[in-house]
Amino acid sequence: MDLTGLLITIVVAFLITVLLSPIFIPFLRRLNFGQSIREEGPQSHQKKTGTPTMGGLMIIFSIIITSLIMASRTDEGINYQVWLLIFVLFGYGLLGFLDDFIKVAMKRNLGLTSKQKLFGQIIIALVFYFILRNQGFSTVIYVPGTELQFDIGWFYAVLVIFMMVGASNAVNLTDGLDGLLAGTAAIAFGAFAIIAWYGIPDHVVAVFSLAVVGALLGFLVFNAHPAKVFMGDTGSLALGGAIAAISILLKLEILLIIIGGVFVIETLSVIIQVISFKTTGKRVFKMSPLHHHYELLGWSEWRVVTTFWLVGLLFAMLGVYIEVGM
């Protein structure tokens, strides 16, 4: 596959999502699968109540179809990596779907309990790990930009679980404003696609990553402010699990912290807020995750989103430079 094939991958995923949306969004609306907005959230968000959610189903469908079509055109073909990535995407997407369904259809605001969600996340991560090890996958981790490497043996299983659970939750936390996650995730997956194509190389993972980029760009047409649909936990958990799986397959476990810098910052803002409030009774931020803090400072939603996109782009460029440029 050449660069034309990579461009076609993005276009195919984009078109599938764009063409599905005018059919699927009204379908979600007829089912009354509307987003409920937290009362303690910014007041400007209350008008979003009832906006169709679970749009992540379109993203997942587009990624799977595009990946299978385009991966078959690579020299590697549809190998175990493709099926592993699809498994993770579908598995975490299913977990998110159950969470969303309980919220919107069964009218339980909290969805799955934290223990139920964590259990599902760990099980999927463990299956992913054992399949990797069965394929003879190395337990060595590499320090980006250096010659340093460490074989961590059985502890690699713990690392995989931590990464997949952590990434899925971090990405989920970032999904709080119109277009915020779709844009930052598209940038992050794009960075991994560049590294997979030019740096590693691993063309199958590059194709999957670009399928995600195309699907997210198509979703942005309907998710940018004012959003006509939300991806819900169905999409955010799937994307978080997938980006962790990609970084593991490419042996870029540490680099995920940089390329996914926006997700890391959003998560840290929540952790800092909770620790500060529990220990001192005071809040560091007006509200967490961090994007809500800037909203309450008076920033428009679009300004917050575009600023986070730019920050995400800087993190992505730094990650690509460390792995490919150096």
UniProtKB/Swiss-Prot annotation:
Its EC number is 2.7.8.13. The chain crosses the membrane at residues 5-25, 51-71, 82-102, 122-142, 148-168, 180-200, 204-224, 229-249, 252-272, 304-324. GO terms for biological process: cell division; cell wall organization; peptidoglycan biosynthetic process; regulation of cell shape. GO terms for molecular function: metal ion binding; phospho-N-acetylmuramoyl-pentapeptide-transferase activity; UDP-N-acetylmuramoyl-L-alanyl-D-glutamyl-meso-2,6-diaminopimelyl-D-alanyl-D-alanine:undecaprenyl-phosphate transferase activity. One of its GO terms (cellular component) is plasma membrane. The keyword Lipid metabolism does not apply. Its cofactor is Mg(2+). The keyword Magnesium applies. Belongs to the glycosyltransferase 4 family. MraY subfamily. NCBIfam families: mraY. Catalyzes the initial step of the lipid cycle reactions in the biosynthesis of the cell wall peptidoglycan: transfers peptidoglycan precursor phospho-MurNAc-pentapeptide from UDP-MurNAc-pentapeptide onto the lipid carrier undecaprenyl phosphate, yielding undecaprenyl-pyrophosphoryl-MurNAc-pentapeptide, known as lipid I. This is Phospho-N-acetylmuramoyl-pentapeptide-transferase. It comes from Oceanobacillus iheyensis (strain DSM 14371 / CIP 107618 / JCM 11309 / KCTC 3954 / HTE831).
